[in-house]
Regions:
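Active-site nucleotide-donor binding segment shared across nucleotidyl transfer reactions
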Residues: 2-51
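Non-catalytic helical "accessory" subdomain of NTase-fold nucleotidyltransferases
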Residues: 7, 13-17, 88-89, 96, ...
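Short, low-complexity, polar/charged sequence segments that are solvent-exposed and flexible
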Residues: 15, 35-39, 64-67, 110-113
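Conserved catalytic core of two-metal-ion nucleotidyltransferases
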Residues: 59-102
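Phosphate-handling catalytic interfaces
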Residues: 101-137, 141
């Protein structure tokens, strides 16, 4: 879809780091597997300049989408901006200071810079080991199953022991 390509091109041009479900999907596709079987326009990426990125992405999308249906808002966490169209999330852009942003291990998949799958597994492990961390904001059963499936797929495609530095 249009929004999908705009977000991908925007993040590529600014060398932003995809994380979350889209990063997992891109990593798995590089190994012949997948998480999503269709376009998923719910992107998550990291940025040292998240406010500017959110408003710039909103302006860019507004060139072809109805501007009165687009907005950039503060998401659930104050360090994340959400770009929405018709009240549906298109992108969550999370602040990461330059000093940390440059240290995050990444790989390239389909021309996108994504969090290294083994690093992403840390987030998955955290979600699985602390299922009540965001309670009551989440559906525990659905979220837990989703994270468990993601963790298994990542571990099969990217066995952690293969990527240990000595």
């Amino acid at each position: 879809t249009f929004a999908y390509q705009v977000v991908v091109d925007f993040a590529r041009a600014r060398n932003r780091i995809f994380t979350g479900g889209m990063a997992i999907d891109l990593a798995l596709k590089s190994k012949g597997s997948f998480l999503y079987d269709k376009y998923n326009i719910d992107f998550d990426f990291l940025s040292p300049d998240f406010h500017r990125d959110a408003f710039d992405l909103t302006d860019l999308l507004g060139q072809d989408l109805e501007k009165d249906r687009l907005n950039a808002i503060v998401a659930m966490h104050p360090s994340t901006m959400r770009v929405r169209y018709n009240f549906q999330a298109i992108a969550d852009i999370t602040y990461t200071p330059h000093e940390l942003f440059d240290l995050i291990p990444t790989i390239e998949a389909n021309g996108c810079r994504i969090v290294h799958p083994c690093y992403q597994m840390i987030d998955q492990h955290l979600a699985l080991s602390m299922p009540y961390a965001n309670e009551p904001l989440i559906n525990l059963g659905g979220r837990y199953k989703k994270d468990f499936i993601r963790q298994l797929k990542l571990m099969r495609a990217f066995p952690p022991a293969k990527y240990v530095k000595e």
